[in-house]
Amino acid sequence: AVLVTFALSSPITSIAKSAEFFTIGTGGPTGVYFQTGNAICKMLHKSAISADHGRKKGTAKAYRCTAPSTGGSNYNIGQIKDGEFQFGVAQSDWQYHAVNGTSKWEGNQFSNLRAVFSVHNEPFQIWASKKSKIKDFKSLKGKVVNIGNPGSGQRGTMEELMKAMGVDNSYFKSVTELTSSEQVKALCDGKIDAFGYSVGFPNGAMEQAATCKAKASPINLTGAPVQGLISGADYYAKAVIPKGTYSNQKKDATTFGVKATVVTSADVSEELVYLVTKAVMDNFDDFKAQHPAFGFLKKEDMIKAGLSAPLHPGAIKAYKEA
C-alpha cells in the first residue's frame, strides 16, 4: 500500500478524490493491538460511503486504512516519527517517554507526538509454565525467560521491571527475544520457562498458553519494587487479572499495568485524525463489540486516561461533537 501524509490545505482536484492510503501500526497478529488497529479501520470504512472507497460525506478525499502486524509500541512510534505510519497503537508509558525524551527515547525526543485516544487496560503479565514452579519474580532466577523483541512495549516494560528489581539479563539462565506471536509456542514447546507481556484480557494467545502442555498461568508481581514503579509514574497503576479469566487460573493475579493508546503526529492532517476519531465515536457500541477487552470502555475516559502527549486538534474536534 502507498503510505500518504495528508495536507488538506492543497487545492482539491479530481486526482485528490481517488483513494489515499494510511497506516495504523499495531502489534503481533495474536495480540489486542492488531485487533485494535483493524477495529479502527473497520469503523472508518463503516462510516464511509462504500461506493466512494472510504470518502466521508462533505470531504473531497477518500481514505483507505490498513493496520498491519508490527513490532509493537516503540516501533510504531518510531515509524510515525519517520513519517512511515500515520497512526500507531502504543502503551501509555512509551507514549510518555517518547514525547518527553526519557528512558529509551532520551536523545531522540518526539515532541510532535500527539494523542488520539486511549483504549483498554493492559496489565503487564509474566506467564510461567506449571513445570517451572515459578510463583513470583524472585523465582525467575536461573530460568529461561523471553524478554520480548527489541522495539516492543513488552521488552521496554520488562526492562523497566528488571531495573526496579535490581537485576539484569544475567539473573536468568538465558533470555530470548521472541515476538509476542512466537513466545506462546516456545512456552508450550518447553523451550522457555516464562515470558513477559503487556496485553488486555481475555486474550486468545494467553488462553492457548493456559491450555497447552505447559499449563501456564500468570504470576503475581507485587512488593516494594513494583509499588515503587506505580508510585513513581502516572502511567502505571495496580492491575488484577481475576481468577477464572483463563483455564486453570485458580487465583487472582495481581500486577501493574498501562493503557493501550492510539497516537499520531502533529504533521498528520486535522481532517484525517478527525475522521478516524469520529468513526470510532459514532460507532462506539460496534467498536466495543470488536474485542472483549473493549467492553468496559467509556468515551469520557478515552480522552484523558493514559494520555501524556497533547491531544491532536482533529481528535479534539471529534470529541466536541461526540
What are these regions (language model features)?
Residues A19, A60-A62, G72-Y75, D82, ...:
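Extracytoplasmic
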Residues F21-H53, E122-D189, D285, A305, ...:
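Bilobed "Venus flytrap"/periplasmic-binding protein-like clamshell domains
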Residues K143-E160, Y235-K304:
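Ligand-binding clefts/hinges and TM-proximal coupling segments of bilobed small-molecule sensing domains
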Residues E182, V199-K213, P218-N220, K259, ...:
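An extracytoplasmic/periplasmic, membrane-proximal ligand-sensing/linker region
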Residues F85-H120, G200-G204:
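Acidic, polar ligand-binding/catalytic clefts
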